[in-house]
Amino acid sequence: MTSFTVSPPPHIKKKIFIKNLIWSRIVALLPISAAAVYFFGFAALGNIIASILGAVGIEFVIQKAFNKKLTIMDGNAIYLGLLLALICPPTLPAWMIFIGGAFAVGVGKHAFGGIGSYTFHPSLAAWVFLSLAWAQDMLPGTIPILSSFSDLILENGAGFLTDVSPILVLLAGVILILVKYIEWRIPLSYLLTTVILALVLGDPLAYVVSGTFLLGVFFIATETVTSPVTQNGRIVYGILCGFLTVIYGYFSGNYVWGTLYALLLSNAVAPFIELKTLPKPMGGVANE
């Protein structure tokens, strides 16, 4: 007997190719990358290039070794390498982030079966790997604090590349939502949960809102492979991400790392959330 499984609604009613989705995210990250290069100089540019080369290089090697179709032009390896570079400090040696980019694609992506099959976001998995392998080098020089409105535009206390300009990350995320390349439920529930819970606990939003946090909200948490496909599941997932971010940030005093570790833990339970929020089939019963 052959079974055919269809994912729960909403279903896309127009042609949107994965390649288009990926490249749209890359384009959205370009202004953020440019701001990082402007602020940090050639160190940032070198790390971005090294991370992308590591990701693209290992993709080429793996697909050639196993006689698979080369998919470099779909942009996925480029995107994963770029995203990893943005959540690393500019002081990280280029050879380390090259290894990180290779780890993201070689282990985080292909070891789990390739695009569409991984449990953890590959860039996030690579960030954790780098943090464990070279903990001292991965420590940001500073923790960003928004002391004035101008810090939203250009943050002088940026620790990671993406922390340079939180407003650019926010604008990029909002634009992707407006063009429907990002579904709004996860970012909204994640953002609201984090802000409300942080205020309840008495943490100033200046400590909470950073480029890394917003990148997590709009780009990492919304990764379609590692987040639930159900509408209710996405809301629950966003709430969980926000809750874990604040709990880690509140007790550690570091909302930047809190964001990334919260997303990693949320990735782990995303399949369970999806299972428990599947819509009741017609004539059937909901998942217990």
UniProtKB/Swiss-Prot annotation:
Membrane spanning stretches: 26-46, 47-67, 80-100, 101-121, 126-146, 159-179, 200-220, 235-255, 256-276
Location of this chain's protein in the cell: Cell membrane
Cysteines paired by S-S bonds: none
Protein family membership: Belongs to the NqrB/RnfD family.
Originating species: Methanosarcina acetivorans (strain ATCC 35395 / DSM 2834 / JCM 12185 / C2A)
Protein name (database record): Ion-translocating oxidoreductase complex subunit D
HAMAP family: RsxD_RnfD
GO cellular component: a single term: plasma membrane
Listed GO biological process terms: electron transport chain; transmembrane transport
Membrane topology: Multi-pass membrane protein
Annotated signal peptide: none
Function, as annotated: Part of a membrane-bound complex that couples electron transfer with translocation of ions across the membrane. Catalyzes Na(+) transport, most probably coupled to electron transfer from reduced ferredoxin to methanophenazine and heterodisulfide reductase. Involved in heterodisulfide reduction during methanogenesis from acetate.
